[in-house]
UniProtKB/Swiss-Prot annotation:
Free-text cofactor note: Binds 1 zinc ion per subunit.
Reactions catalysed, as given in the entry: 7-aminomethyl-7-carbaguanine + guanosine(34) in tRNA = 7-aminomethyl-7-carbaguanosine(34) in tRNA + guanine
Organism of provenance: Thermus thermophilus (strain ATCC BAA-163 / DSM 7039 / HB27)
NCBIfam families on file: Q_tRNA_tgt (TIGR00430), tgt_general (TIGR00449)
Superkingdom to which the source organism belongs: Bacteria
Name of protein: Queuine tRNA-ribosyltransferase
Pfam families xref list: TGT
Residues annotated as binding Zn(2+): 303, 305, 308, 334
UniProt keyword annotation of Zinc present: yes
Length: 385
């Protein structure tokens, strides 16, 4: 039997609950993946992540290629043996980090030559090299090498980029040798509907185990972003998981889940925590604010995370203002649990056929009377508003 299967178990409008089977266990979707950039989620141990309901972790190919190197990770048991997380892993292709972090020297048909942000050495990353690195790392879910254009980009560049990404997908697929890893293709096209449609349809032709919506959440307006998510989920096959890359704001998750997105990842919840802010249903609490210094309440009433069950806002505000490492750890733990509770509640609402009620209640608490048009339109397109 194929170690990778995806089955839809419940629907409400275009939202769906699914089960994704991998060699390291089955997971329920929609789900949010914490980002373990260098093989660890900053400040959190695997047992912490398991306790708060994390199901899949993401690691960055670019960072692990530079340090400690893929062959060392392979020799030490792959990510599952090396990093201590025994559940499923996903690795990205390295393309986005090359474009955003590396001092890129050249991009051509062969691949990308960039300068390491660590030591300045020149490194060449091609589709074949990206797949080889990801096979050495041993994640369950791996990504085809792609080019993520910045926003805004001229239409001519977007078109050339998406065509190159399709050719790189073909090369990624030919380079793949491990049957115990599932390769996802990434659709690009920016916010141009025609190019996004073309990229998505051409990517689907490869008949892959899953598909990613790439090139969004890079600075474009929310209206444009969700128009592309709506178009993409309408075109992508119903029987394969859909992954919206780099998206982690709660309101974005609620809108995208309503359109049928299954997988998400983002550094937002942990980075926000390290910067001293907590996610709550009304938005964010900036614990640097003096008004929290005598506030005994937990960050979020009803939250079952260790942070909320143990500490008040006053203590957390003290840690943040004192620059204590524990402050960022406790806030990161809460923020991830906040997103996991959100996806858990979404799955329950979908199973009970009331995703629209769930989304409207979320909007009432998050936005009050000023619900942004993009949010309403996305939910309406999913059959929930």
């Amino acid at each position: 039997m194929d170690p990778f299967r995806f089955q839809v178990e419940a629907r409400a409008g275009r939202a769906r609950v699914g089960r994704l089977f991998t060699p390291h266990g089955a997971v329920e979707t929609p789900l949010f993946m914490p980002v373990g950039t260098a093989g660890s989620v900053k400040g959190l141990m695997p047992k912490d992540l398991e306790a708060i309901g994390s199901q899949v972790l993401l690691a960055n190919t670019y960072h692990l290629l530079l340090r400690p190197g893929p062959e060392r990770v392979r020799a030490l048991g792959g990510l599952h043996g090396f990093a201590g997380w025994k559940g499923p892993w996903l690795t990205d292709s390295g393309g986005f980090q090359v474009m955003s972090l590396g001092h890129m020297r050249r991009i051509d048909e062969e691949g990308v030559v960039f300068q390491s942000h660590l030591d300045g050495r020149l490194i060449k990353l091609t589709p074949e090299r990206s797949i080889a690195v990801q096979e050495a790392l041993g994640a369950d879910l791996i990504m085809a090498f792609d080019e993520c254009p910045p926003y805004p980009s001229p239409r001519e560049y977007l078109e050339a980029s998406l065509e190159r990404t399709l050719r790189w997908l073909e090369r990624s697929l030919k380079a793949k040798t491990r049957p115990d890893q599932a390769l996802f293709g990434i659709a690009q096209g920016g916010t141009d509907p025609e190019l996004r449609r073309r990229s998505t349809l051409e990517t689907i032709r490869f008949d892959l185990p899953g598909y990613a919506i790439g090139g969004l959440a890079v600075g474009e307006p929310k209206e444009a972003m969700f128009a592309m998510v709506e178009l993409s989920t309408r075109l992508l096959p119903e029987d394969r998981p859909r992954y919206l890359m780099g998206v982690g704001h709660p309101e974005d998750l609620v809108a995208a889940m309503g359109l049928g997105v299954d997988l998400f990842d983002c550094v937002y919840p942990t980075r926000t925590g390290r910067f001293g802010s907590a996610l709550v249903p009304e938005g964010r609490l900036n614990l640097k604010n003096a008004r929290f210094l005598e506030d005994r309440r937990p960050l979020e009433e009803g939250c079952d995370c260790y942070t909320c069950q143990t500490f008040g806002r006053a203590y957390l505000a003290h840690l943040v203002r004192a620059g204590e490492m524990l402050g960022g750890i406790l806030l990161s733990l809460h923020n991830l649990r906040h997103l996991h509770r959100l996806t858990e509640a979404a799955r329950q609402a979908i199973r009970e056929g009331r995703y629209g009620d769930f989304a409207r209640e979320f909007a009432r608490r998050r936005f009050g009377r000023e619900v942004p048009p993009w949010f309403r339109e996305a939910l309406a397109a999913g059959g929930h508003w």
